[in-house]
Amino acid sequence: MRIVLLGPPGAGKGTQAQKLAEKLGIPQISTGDLFRYNISNGTELGLEAKKYLDAGDLVPATLTNALVDDRLDDEDAAAGFILDGYPRSVEQAKALDEMLKKRDLSLDAVLEFRVPEEELVSRLKGRGRDDDTEDVIRNRFRVYRDETAPLLDYYSADLKTVDAVGELDEVFARALKALGR
């Protein structure tokens, strides 16, 4: 299966992606992990990304797209994958479509993990990170709504909504059900 996970910060995408990857026997592909791997291994793309990250800038979409494109060529992704944190914009979604098209593939599912904003604020404040102030958290939601919400329309034909409030295993069961598993 080829799956994209969407949802705001604190919705549990990373945790659920890990559980789904384990259950389905396919890799979880996170852009954060891709950046760290390529930087620590000194790849050309990693060194390029490091320049932006060291300067505190966002890595350009073209570079992120190239990292994802390379990762999709890895043998473990041949049977499927779970994309966690990518795409973040319609532009990246279109780039992903092209990556899949050149491999004669398509997405099987797009899951949106939905949690009320007040619950997300509570979750994120509970993590105890210094930078997780309420203002910072609410700004992250605004950025998510502005940039990622259009993806919900873009993927409307394949989109399945998962209620991500509740115990980890309850949310996992809902995600599996949304995937028809």
Swiss-Prot record:
Gene3D superfamilies: P-loop containing nucleotide triphosphate hydrolases. It is found in: Cytoplasm. One of its GO terms (cellular component) is cytoplasm. InterPro entries: Adenyl_kin_sub, Adenylat/UMP-CMP_kin, Adenylat_kinase_CS, P-loop_NTPase. The keyword DNA-binding does not apply. One of its GO terms (biological process) is AMP salvage. Residues 126-132 are annotated as: LID. Its EC number is 2.7.4.3. The keyword Transport does not apply. CDD domains: ADK. AMP binds at residues 31, 36, 57-59, 85-88, 92, 129, 140. It catalyses: AMP + ATP = 2 ADP. It holds the Pfam family ADK. Catalyzes the reversible transfer of the terminal phosphate group between ATP and AMP. Plays an important role in cellular energy homeostasis and in adenine nucleotide metabolism. PANTHER family: NUCLEOTIDE KINASE. Belongs to the adenylate kinase family. Monomer. This is Adenylate kinase. It comes from Mycolicibacterium vanbaalenii (strain DSM 7251 / JCM 13017 / BCRC 16820 / KCTC 9966 / NRRL B-24157 / PYR-1). The lineage of its organism: Bacteria, Bacillati, Actinomycetota, Actinomycetes, Mycobacteriales.
